[in-house]
Amino acid sequence: MPRPRPLLLAVMAATLADIILAADPAPAGPAPRPPNFLLIMADDLGIGDLGCYGNKTLRTPHLDRLAREGVKLTQHLAAAPLCTPSRAAFLTGRYPPRSGMAAHGRVGVYLFTASSGGLPPSEVTMARLLKGRGYATALIGKWHLGLSCRGATDFCHHPLRHGFDRFLGVPTTNLRDCRPGAGTVFGPALRVFAAGPLAALGASLAAMAAARWAGLARVPGWALAGTAAAMLAVGGPRSASCLGFRPANCFLMDDLAVAQRPTDYGGLTRRLADEAALFLRRNRARPFLLFLSFLHVHTAHFADPGFAGRSLHGAYGDSVEEMDWGVGRVLAALDELGLARETLVYFTSDHGAHVEELGPRGERMGGSNGVFRGGKGNNWEGGVRVPCLVRWPRELSPGRVVAEPTSLMDVFPTVARLAGAELPGDRVIDGRDLMPLLRGDAQRSEHEFLFHYCNAYLQAVRWHNGSAVWKAFYFTPNFAPAGANGCFSTHVCLCAGPAHVTAHDPPLLFDLTRDPGERRPLTPEAEPRHREVLDAIDAAARAHRARLRPAPDQLAPRHLMWKPWLQLWGGGGAGGGAGAQDDSGHAHGDGSHAHDDPGHAQDRGDDDAHYGGHATTRTQATPR
């Protein structure tokens, strides 16, 4: 038998080795640690307010740094042009009507802490999903999604019931009425929302009383008493709330306790930024989700002495620049702790700038939406197109720009997938994973259609087909005065009623690729595909509505009104019983979160020159 040749033996050995290696591959290296998440949201910030989006006069160096080091999105869209529904959609990845967080009436946000509406406990937030994956979770800043349902301390809508381990912030929002000398929103609100019903009830009461006194008709006493009670129900709570609004509604909570009443705006931005840095420090050894929700730049405007009067845009500009400082302070904490590479940082605004905000002398107190029409409260691009910056050094190339349509709702599935959490299978999730676009693996958004709601009413639909982005309006707000860029007579545009909106049949159609400012509606004569585009959009709208399950209206008048038995006083958490627990049943209230970590000095950095180098004293939580 001939002996095998050496070359043949070598080939056979190599082949056998390949087979063995293919059948039993070498063990892979350890899987990368799931990222941390720092999600930052401004309030009422316009896309035209940041240097990285073209502003040349406001100083936003820390946000501009995020843009350079990460990805900038230029067609990022709020799911609603108002605070409450937009934030509900952000945390759940769902259009606001799916959770009942879209009003059928005129008022679309919570004004009182003692209202019974809020984000339903049945909704699944990103915090709840990530908490189930072992993440530490915190919300610092503004909530605005309700507090309690039936009693002042049941806290059914509280952040701790929605997956957050830690909450330091305001349960509702920042309003002019919260800061002495900043004016009021209730004068216009009473005029717009209560004047008509009160006038009608008053006229009825006067007519019945006159008829009874003159003997012209037999008017029972219960009719007079009932009408008077109705007047009290309409005007009384609002008037009482106006008189005592600040102590009742403007307070800072530390978990379940009232930590400060009324809110002290001095050093508030520093306090929130320091609390965020402290949370990072305490949880640097485990994955975390931190939602930093600034009160800036909603009125009432505020800024510490180091920022007040420094900007070229008055109190509004001062607020923007102080907020940017706060962002920088938290980014510096990530750097100091060596966490920047492993942390996905996301920055946005809940909706566009409030263009109707004016000062006592008529000066502009709101922000800039750049070239875009409209603003907060309506679905023109200025109301829903918001800044968006995403940085994750481990995964994302710096300096990229994504111009595709994306949504605040996309953060929910993106965060869930990266954390290894399973999306809930018993409900529709409207958001889409952003990572293929952010990495550059995909060039097209997964959103073919996006639906723009004004409260519970579908106002417009966006269609991204091919290279075009079409937008069709079923109704548009009536700007007042005529020719203005907002609804100055009502302080914000309303969503229904012939005096406030104009219906369009056929819908008003724009091509945002050619006309991003929505100045030139298309006609059948100018656009050959006019009918084809509208037919496709109408079909998508019908299919979308067919998938909407009715949900209890959390912004119905009965849930919006002030209810004295829900008013939270004192420490709030004392004797809370079952109410003093988070969504997993863990009790809170030992006050341990209220103290600075004594083992770590808080480096102040060069930016503290704005504050004169003084540390801020943190108010302890009221004992519970």
Curated annotation (Swiss-Prot):
It is found in: Microsome membrane; Endoplasmic reticulum membrane. Pfam families: Sulfatase, Sulfatase_C. Residues 1-22 form the signal peptide. Binds 1 Ca(2+) ion per subunit. The chain crosses the membrane at residues 193-216, 221-242. Ca(2+) binds at residues 43-44, 83, 350-351. It catalyses: dehydroepiandrosterone 3-sulfate + H2O = 3beta-hydroxyandrost-5-en-17-one + sulfate + H(+); estrone 3-sulfate + H2O = estrone + sulfate + H(+). Belongs to the sulfatase family. This is Steryl-sulfatase.
